Amino acid sequence: MTSWQRLCWHYRLWTLGCYMLLAILALKLSLRLKCDFDAMDLDSEEFQSQYCRDLLYKTLKLPAKSSINCSGVIRGEQKAVTQALLNNLEIKKKQQLFTEADYLRMTADCEHFKTKRKFIQVPLSKEEASFPIAYSMVVHEKIENFERLLRAVYTPQNVYCVHMDQKSSEPFKQAVRAIVSCFPNVFIASKLVSVVYASWSRVQADLNCMEDLLQSPVPWKYLLNTCGTDFPIKTNAEMVKALKLLKGQNSMESEVPPPHKKSRWKYHYEVTDTLHMTSKRKTPPPNNLTMFTGNAYMVASRDFIEHVFSNSKARQLIEWVKDTYSPDEHLWATLQRASWMPGSDPLHRKFDLSDMRAIARLTKWYDHEGDIENGAPYTSCSGIHQRAVCVYGSGDLHWILQNHHLLANKFDPKVDDNVLQCLEEYLRHKAIYGTEL
């Protein structure tokens, strides 16, 4: 073999070696970049890869309705907030929300609906998969609000009971049923009631869902209850961590009632289309219970919910409050201070928990808004007020996200869709990347 032939032979071997090395590197890279979305765990080494997270986020990123600076709105930058508020004024005139007919059409193909509407269809971590949450969702109108709320809290390991007001419109009920039918872990409450504002029926709607959820095969740990104007301000992963920290305790507003609220259970109330106070005085609470006041929303352990149905003293209190005014605002608060209820707090006033200290729901009340430097708990609402409660605007989002609550109330895309869009973007980005926008 001549020196030229030997040189050519060595060159071929070198080239072949280079190709083999490149092939091995390509194989290793492809294995590293393989993202198993069916057995996903964002805490695993595989999903520490920026490639996998980017791919997942691209798949689940929600389409923006408006070109606003959500990062700036979330940080509370005045220029971004002002632009979002002005943009909201412009789009409100021509805004078209999805109708019941739209949802009937979209859900004709469930897989397409879930993919197009960007529902998260796999648990994002092993920790979340092993800690399912139950939701009691009471709704009566505004179908897009319901679907966006469901999408925001939905994961396949959780379980969701939806109570529709029996007097809701037929198109609304059909659309809710159509949406629910697309998910194996979402169902309609087995018993529906007509809900009258501030009456017992609001509690009964939740109780119907609670009873159904206790029959579910899903081994949920905690229950959260929602209404149609709620929205989460924490990701599911953050909720799981917060619930684990409770270690079996509940978290809900429960305080000594001010004098003006005591009349709510001193007199018998009658229900027609609305609630009417009579002159008939009620007997004292059963079992010499001390009454407390709070709100309709709770973060309650499974043990607590089970005792609502099985404990005779709890059942007696439930019967007693049925003819009171807004029983949802004192039933749960009082049970939370009963020593025989799991996860409850002691009676002493030092254990009072305000709505700002509980994690169940963040709400801005009109009569508490003002200048923080002068002692107000929060600044003025940037949206509008409904029954003295702030319907949030874009200017509220920075404040909202500084708080420890799991959900906030009230949101309405008809009032300000941009605050919802930015909150949705924030939650989806944080769910995938673990960081803010």
Swiss-Prot record:
The keyword Glycosyltransferase appears for this protein: yes
One example GO MF annotation: acetylgalactosaminyl-O-glycosyl-glycoprotein beta-1,6-N-acetylglucosaminyltransferase activity
UniProt PTM comment: N-glycosylated.
Subcellular location: Golgi apparatus membrane
Main localisation: Golgi
Disulfide bonds: 70-227, 161-381, 182-209, 390-422
Pathway: Protein modification; protein glycosylation
Record EC number: 2.4.1.102, 2.4.1.148, 2.4.1.150
Function: Glycosyltransferase that can synthesize all known mucin beta 6 N-acetylglucosaminides. Mediates core 2 and core 4 O-glycan branching, 2 important steps in mucin-type biosynthesis. Also has I-branching enzyme activity by converting linear into branched poly-N-acetyllactosaminoglycans, leading to introduce the blood group I antigen during embryonic development.
Keywords (A to Z) from UniProt: Disulfide bond, Glycoprotein, Glycosyltransferase, Golgi apparatus, Membrane, Signal-anchor, Transferase, Transmembrane, Transmembrane helix
Membrane topology, Cytoplasmic segments: 1-12
Organism: Mus musculus
Gene label: Gcnt3
Reaction catalysed by this enzyme: a 3-O-[beta-D-galactosyl-(1->3)-N-acetyl-alpha-D-galactosaminyl]-L-seryl-[protein] + UDP-N-acetyl-alpha-D-glucosamine = 3-O-{beta-D-galactosyl-(1->3)-[N-acetyl-beta-D-glucosaminyl-(1->6)]-N-acetyl-alpha-D-galactosaminyl}-L-seryl-[protein] + UDP + H(+); a 3-O-[beta-D-galactosyl-(1->3)-N-acetyl-alpha-D-galactosaminyl]-L-threonyl-[protein] + UDP-N-acetyl-alpha-D-glucosamine = a 3-O-{beta-D-galactosyl-(1->3)-[N-acetyl-beta-D-glucosaminyl-(1->6)]-N-acetyl-alpha-D-galactosaminyl}-L-threonyl-[protein] + UDP + H(+); a beta-D-Gal-(1->4)-beta-D-GlcNAc-(1->3)-beta-D-Gal-(1->4)-beta-D-GlcNAc derivative + UDP-N-acetyl-alpha-D-glucosamine = a beta-D-Gal-(1->4)-beta-D-GlcNAc-(1->3)-[beta-D-GlcNAc-(1->6)]-beta-D-Gal-(1->4)-N-acetyl-beta-D-glucosaminyl derivative + UDP + H(+); 3-O-[N-acetyl-beta-D-glucosaminyl-(1->3)-N-acetyl-alpha-D-galactosaminyl]-L-seryl-[protein] + UDP-N-acetyl-alpha-D-glucosamine = 3-O-[N-acetyl-beta-D-glucosaminyl-(1->3)-[N-acetyl-beta-D-glucosaminyl-(1->6)]-N-acetyl-alpha-D-galactosaminyl]-L-seryl-[protein] + UDP + H(+)
Matching InterPro entries: Glyco_trans_14
GO cellular component, one term: Golgi membrane
Bilayer topology term: Single-pass type II membrane protein
GO BP term (any one): intestinal absorption
Family: Belongs to the glycosyltransferase 14 family.
Record bears the keyword Transferase: yes
Coiled-coil region: none
Superkingdom in the source lineage: Eukaryota
Topological domains annotated Lumenal: 31-437
Protein name: Beta-1,3-galactosyl-O-glycosyl-glycoprotein beta-1,6-N-acetylglucosaminyltransferase 3
Glycosylation sites: 288
TM segment ranges: 13-30
